[in-house]
Regions:
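Hydrophobic alpha-helical transmembrane segments
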Residues: 4-9, 46-47, 81-86, 122-130, ...
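Lipid-exposed faces of alpha-helical membrane segments in multi-pass integral membrane proteins
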Residues: 6, 10, 52, 90, ...
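Juxtamembrane membrane-interface segments at transmembrane alpha-helix termini
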Residues: 35-40, 60-61, 159-169
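Transmembrane helical segments that form the transport core of multi-pass membrane transport proteins
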Residues: 135, 139-254
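Membrane-interfacial helix-loop connectors
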Residues: 14-18, 25-56, 65, 69-85, ...
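Short juxtamembrane and helix-loop transition motifs at transmembrane-helix boundaries
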Residues: 7-11, 106-117, 218-222
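Long, contiguous bundles of hydrophobic transmembrane helices that form the permeation core
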Residues: 92-171
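Transmembrane-helix bundle segments that line or gate the permeation/cavity pathway
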Residues: 43, 49, 56, 60-61, ...
Length: 289
């Protein structure tokens, strides 16, 4: 039960910086290694991690792709997202408390291993934080798109990667570009296809009809609650992109509500968020639909 809470709390606080997908993958690997003898624990812990990562990512522009999209579109300022921290905590704590009653107090078997951080690993973490600071600074002070700040962060990594390659005594030299070549291109192409499809619907005129029904007939609050429910079924990224394409006239409070519901609504089903989809593959049948 302690491991259940530790991984959940870590997921909640790591997600705003590392994004919910990365956080879920890292902590799922921990749960799989420590709780391999208990499939029930792995299942509950993975659900807990997904809920925590999605809730934690809702109050940071870097916590989820949906929040990043809203920030880049200029609908909500960077520091305004932190107003969602209390709702995010509530969205994590209530499901976690309920799930904790189904977790036993057994102690996992511990394997003693000598684990060392690779050469330059700590400095790369620092570069990651510096990259986030660069993206925020570029956007707030110079009114440049955040992508320029993130690409500048990639240049930090390229320069430091060259330093590692020159100074590290390793059988296989460190190569940043080789690591980039192994990223999940299928996921990127999926998002690319979804965005093109939604843009096509907007060009034809269907999004205007949907916007009229949701934000005029139903009202902004009801519509944004519906956004959360749809996020669990369709995935939160295409839903948020559709909302941004509709561009309804809403106050910041309603944009924050849409951001929150899209982020945490994806936790209701395993296919509702990138973190949930990724863990279905990594958990090897222990975390399913």
């Amino acid at each position: 039960r302690q491991l259940f809470w530790i991984t959940g709390v870590l997921a909640f606080f790591m997600s705003p910086l590392a994004d919910n997908l990365t956080t879920a993958l890292v902590l799922c690997a921990v749960v799989m290694a420590v709780g391999s003898a208990s499939p029930k624990f792995i299942s509950m812990a993975c659900i807990n991690i997904v809920v925590a990562a999605n809730a934690g990512g809702a109050f940071s522009p870097f916590g989820d792709i949906t929040t990043l999209m809203v920030w880049q579109a200029g609908k909500v300022e960077f520091f305004t997202f932190f107003a969602l921290i209390i709702p995010s905590i509530v969205n994590y704590i209530i499901p976690a408390v309920i799930m904790s009653f189904f977790i036993g107090n057994e102690r996992p078997t511990l394997a003693v291993e000598n684990i060392e951080i690779k050469f330059g690993g700590k400095f790369i973490i620092l570069l990651g934080v510096l990259t986030i600071a660069t993206a925020v600074s570029f956007h707030n002070f110079f009114h440049l798109p955040p992508v320029l700040g993130m690409m500048t962060g990639l240049s930090y990594l390229l320069f430091f990667g060259y330093y590692i390659k020159r100074n590290e005594n390793a059988d296989k030299p460190y190569d940043v570009l080789e690591n980039i070549a192994h990223i999940e291109w299928d996921t990127l192409l999926f998002f690319f296809g979804v965005i093109i499809s939604v843009s096509g619907l907007g060009l034809i005129g269907y999004l205007e009809l949907v916007s009229q029904f949701m934000y005029t007939d139903l009202g902004a609050t009801n519509a944004n609650i519906l956004v959360g429910i749809l996020s669990a079924i369709v995935d939160n990224i295409p839903v948020m992109f559709a909302v941004l394409s509709m561009d309804p006239s809403m106050p910041i409070s309603q944009w924050l509500l849409a951001t929150l519901t899209a982020g945490v609504g994806g936790s209701m089903l395993s296919i509702g968020s990138a973190a949930g989809v990724a863990l279905m593959g990594q958990a090897k049948g222990n975390y399913t639909f």
